[in-house]
Amino acid sequence: MSSPGPSQPPAEDPPWPARLLRAPLGLLRLDPSGGALLLCGLVALLGWSWLRRRRARGIPPGPTPWPLVGNFGHVLLPPFLRRRSWLSSRTRAAGIDPSVIGPQVLLAHLARVYGSIFSFFIGHYLVVVLSDFHSVREALVQQAEVFSDRPRVPLISIVTKEKGVVFAHYGPVWRQQRKFSHSTLRHFGLGKLSLEPKIIEEFKYVKAEMQKHGEDPFCPFSIISNAVSNIICSLCFGQRFDYTNSEFKKMLGFMSRGLEICLNSQVLLVNICPWLYYLPFGPFKELRQIEKDITSFLKKIIKDHQESLDRENPQDFIDMYLLHMEEERKNNSNSSFDEEYLFYIIGDLFIAGTDTTTNSLLWCLLYMSLNPDVQEKVHEEIERVIGANRAPSLTDKAQMPYTEATIMEVQRLTVVVPLAIPHMTSENTVLQGYTIPKGTLILPNLWSVHRDPAIWEKPEDFYPNRFLDDQGQLIKKETFIPFGIGKRVCMGEQLAKMELFLMFVSLMQSFAFALPEDSKKPLLTGRFGLTLAPHPFNITISRR
C-alpha cells in the first residue's frame, strides 16, 4: 500500500524515462549581437519558472520543467511526432523502440523514479499521474466531487462543444444527462437478460462472415466492429445495419479515421493554436469534412425518429429522449435537453461503445490464438456447461469461472482505456500529503494499476488462474478496475460485460482460433489512441 506524504527521489542518476524529460533542448548557435538579448530573456524566464515552482511547493515530485515548454509532454507525444523528436534517438539508445511504446508505459516507468503520484508540466499546465490503486481510489472515489471534472482541451471543446456524457464538464447538466441516459439504456435492456437475444442474434452474422473465409487467414477487425456497432445501433436507433450497407460502412470508416486524425496527426497542434483547426488543407480540412458527414448521418436518423415518433410506444433511446425533451420544455424553459445535446450523446454512445468493446474482443481472440492451452480449457468448460447446440446465456456465467477469469485476465493486461479519460480538479485539495491545485489535469494510469507487482504476482504473465481460488471459483478483486471507478466510471460497463461474455463464449463455442502458420508473432504493446487497440493481425479458424 502506498505510504502517504512526499517521498524522496533516489540520489543516483535517474533511469531513462526521467532523463528524457529532463534533457536539454539543445544548444543554440547565435551571433554575438543576439547573445545578450537571449541571456536576459532566459534569466527572466528562469526567474519566472523558479517563482512559479515556489508557489507550487508541495505538489507531487517530478522532472524539472523548462520555462514555457514545461516538460514538453514528450510522454504524451503521438507516434507521428515521437518519431521526429529527440525522444526517438534517446529511447533507442536505451534499447527501447519508441514507435511501439505508448504513453502509459513511459508514465509507468516514471512512477518507479518519482513514486506512485508524480507530476510534470505540459507548457504551464500541471499534470498529475496516479499510478497505483490506492491513489486512484482516494482521488476518484473518496474525493470524487473534486476529481470528477474534465480538462478544457481545445480540440475536444471544438469537436464536442463540451456536450455529451464523456467529455462534458462535471456539474448539474452532466448529472441530469447521465442519469437520464443510464436509466433509459437500462429500460431497453442494459445489464438485463432482455438484451441477450439481440447479442446472440448479432453473433449469427459474425459466424456467417467468418465462415466465408474457410481455412484462409483473415483480419477479424471489421467483422467484430460491425457486430458491436450494431448492438449499440439497436439500443440507440432501434435498428441494425447489414454489414454490406454502404452508409453504415462509411460511418464506421469515418469514425475510425476521425479518431486516428484527432489522436495521431498534426491536428493535435490545435491544442496549442486553436485557430489551426480551420486551416483549409491537410488533416484539418479532412477532419472538418468527417465531422460534417457524421453530423449529417446522425441528424438524419434523429429527424426520421421525430417524424415517426409513437408517443405511446417509444422504440429506442432516441424516442425516449425526444419524449423527455418535450416534457422538459413544458416545465423548464432553460432545460439542457435539446436536439443538439441528443446528437452529442448519441455520438458518445456510438463511438465509445463501439471502440472499447471491439478492441476488448479483438484482444481476446489474439490471446487465445497465442495461448492454445488456455483456449482448450475454455473450450472444455463451454462444452461441459453449455454444449454445442444451445446458445450461451448470462445465467451460465456463475458456472463458467475459468472462462470469466480468462476474459478478466485479457482485460487486465490490455486495459483498453489505459489512461482513462483525463480528469481535472475543480478546487484545491490534498492527496496523500501532496498539494493538488485547482485546474490540475489528472491522469489515472489504469495500465500501471493492473501491472503493479505489489498487487499482481508476475504481472507481465498471462495467467487466468490468478482470478480463481483453490476451489476454482472466481475471485472478485477490488483492484481490478478496467472500466475505471468513481462518478465518471464507464456508463456502458454493464453492456460491455454482457457483450464480452456472450460474444466471446459464442466465438469459442463455434471455432478454434490460431495464428497463420509461419506468421510473425503480433506485437502485444497495442496502438495507443482513444483506446488501446491491438496491432493488425490475421487469424485462421477451424469449426468445432
From Swiss-Prot:
GO terms for molecular function: arachidonate omega-hydroxylase activity; heme binding; iron ion binding; long-chain fatty acid omega-hydroxylase activity; monooxygenase activity; oxidoreductase activity, acting on paired donors, with incorporation or reduction of molecular oxygen, reduced flavin or flavoprotein as one donor, and incorporation of one atom of oxygen; steroid hydroxylase activity. GO terms for cellular component: cytoplasm; endoplasmic reticulum membrane; intracellular membrane-bounded organelle; mitochondrial inner membrane. It catalyses: an omega-methyl-long-chain fatty acid + reduced [NADPH--hemoprotein reductase] + O2 = an omega-hydroxy-long-chain fatty acid + oxidized [NADPH--hemoprotein reductase] + H2O + H(+); (5Z,8Z,11Z,14Z)-eicosatetraenoate + reduced [NADPH--hemoprotein reductase] + O2 = 19-hydroxy-(5Z,8Z,11Z,14Z)-eicosatetraenoate + oxidized [NADPH--hemoprotein reductase] + H2O + H(+); (5Z,8Z,11Z,14Z)-eicosatetraenoate + reduced [NADPH--hemoprotein reductase] + O2 = 20-hydroxy-(5Z,8Z,11Z,14Z)-eicosatetraenoate + oxidized [NADPH--hemoprotein reductase] + H2O + H(+); N-[(5Z,8Z,11Z,14Z)-eicosatetraenoyl]-serotonin + reduced [NADPH--hemoprotein reductase] + O2 = 2-oxo-N-[(5Z,8Z,11Z,14Z)-eicosatetraenoyl]-serotonin + oxidized [NADPH--hemoprotein reductase] + H2O + H(+). Its EC number is 1.14.14.80. Its cofactor is heme. The keyword RNA-binding does not apply. It is found in: Endoplasmic reticulum membrane; Microsome membrane; Mitochondrion inner membrane. SUPFAM superfamilies: Cytochrome P450. InterPro entries: Cyt_P450 (IPR001128), Cyt_P450_CS (IPR017972), Cyt_P450_E_grp-I (IPR002401), Cyt_P450_E_grp-I_CYP2D-like (IPR008069), Cyt_P450_sf (IPR036396), Cytochrome_P450_fam2 (IPR050182). It is linked to Spastic paraplegia 56, autosomal recessive, with or without pseudoxanthoma elasticum: A form of spastic paraplegia, a neurodegenerative disorder characterized by a slow, gradual, progressive weakness and spasticity of the lower limbs. Rate of progression and the severity of symptoms are quite variable. Initial symptoms may include difficulty with balance, weakness and stiffness in the legs, muscle spasms, and dragging the toes when walking. A cytochrome P450 monooxygenase involved in the metabolism of arachidonic acid and its conjugates. Mechanistically, uses molecular oxygen inserting one oxygen atom into a substrate, and reducing the second into a water molecule, with two electrons provided by NADPH via cytochrome P450 reductase (CPR; NADPH-ferrihemoprotein reductase). Acts as an omega and omega-1 hydroxylase for arachidonic acid and possibly for other long chain fatty acids. May modulate the arachidonic acid signaling pathway and play a role in other fatty acid signaling processes. This is Cytochrome P450 2U1. It comes from Homo sapiens. The lineage of its organism: Eukaryota, Metazoa, Chordata, Craniata, Vertebrata. The gene is CYP2U1.
